[in-house]
Regions:
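Conserved RecA-like helicase ATPase core segment
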Residues: 219-267
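Accessory N-terminal region flanking or inserted into the helicase ATPase core
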Residues: 1-32, 36-37, 54-56, 123-207, ...
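Conserved ATP-dependent motor core of P-loop NTPases, especially the RecA-like helicase ATPase domain
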Residues: 19-21, 88, 107-119, 134-140
Length: 267
């Protein structure tokens, strides 16, 4: 089955699939077919000879990545069996576990198990408050990085916050572990501080589904991974289900202002 089988050349999905712009934004509500258009775009690129390892579909869940590959296989798209769609967290753990990256970051990307959090909380000194206060401090530390508050003008940590971060990171380094909320920030810092890193030029095409559900750090990681790539983002600017995970729906609304010559498609 060719990528354009049963696809109306006048349809939005067709226009998205053939768009050769460097930056593409697709805004559509739920159930309008935006993920279908993304699938056809991936199929068109693979059929056009783009190597599967130069193309990165980013999905919000692992199940969505598996669904995309299964549908492409059912279409008989050449090379789709080599395609590796991924969530950003999964990709982040893969990158951070590479030896050359570990040598730079000094952080082991082994996410702490839940039972390991108890000794962490116990080992943090009482000067940071009771157990509940220490838990809140850890959440605030993760939230600040998810929102990239450290990058905002005027943001300044108190002396106690700085001391807390130092003790927290020292503990994590010693125990060769990482908080789940540190994966993306560590990936962000690595990519930002190492613009010549091989990961920055790994992909020629990035395709990102449910962009509005990514937090600010995740959206910035997409920019860094796509420094030399064509980037297509897909999402609904009116619906974000993950505000409790610090989703940044404003990112899709202002994408045309933060990126040059954006090609817009709307359902």
């Amino acid at each position: 089955m060719a990528w354009d089988d049963d696809l109306d050349p006048a349809s939005v999905a067709y226009a998205i699939a053939v768009d050769d712009s460097r930056f593409i934004r697709v805004v559509a509500g739920p159930g309008t077919g935006k993920s279908f258009a993304l699938k056809r775009r991936v199929a068109r690129l693979l059929e056009g000879g783009v190597p599967a390892d130069r193309l990165l579909p980013v999905t919000f869940t692992r199940v969505a990545a598996e669904d995309l590959q299964r549908e492409l296989i059912n279409m008989g798209v050449p090379g789709c069996d080599q395609l590796r769609g991924s969530t950003l967290h999964s990709l982040g753990m893969q990158i951070l576990s590479r030896q050359h990256v570990l040598a730079v970051t000094g952080r082991v990307s082994r996410v702490l198990n839940r039972f390991e959090l108890e000794p962490l909380l116990y080992d943090l000194p009482p000067s940071f408050g009771n157990k509940r206060s220490r838990e809140k401090r850890i959440r605030a530390y993760e939230a600040a990085w998810a929102r990239l508050q450290h990058e905002e003008p005027g943001f300044d940590l108190t002396a106690q916050d700085q001391a807390f971060e130092h003790r927290l990171i020292s503990w994590l380094r010693f125990h060769r572990g990482m908080l789940i909320g540190e994966i993306i920030p560590e990936l962000y810092r690595y990519l930002r501080n190492n613009p010549a890193a091989p990961e920055v030029s790994t992909y020629d095409y990035l395709l990102v589904d449910e962009y509005q559900d990514l937090n600010k750090a995740e959206q910035t990681v997409i920019d860094l991974l796509g420094s030399h790539a064509a980037v297509c983002i897909v999402g609904d600017d009116d619906q974000s289900l993950y505000s409790f995970k610090y989703a940044h729906p404003a990112g899709i609304r202002v994408f045309h202002r933060t990126h040059a010559n954006v090609s817009d498609h709307q359902y």
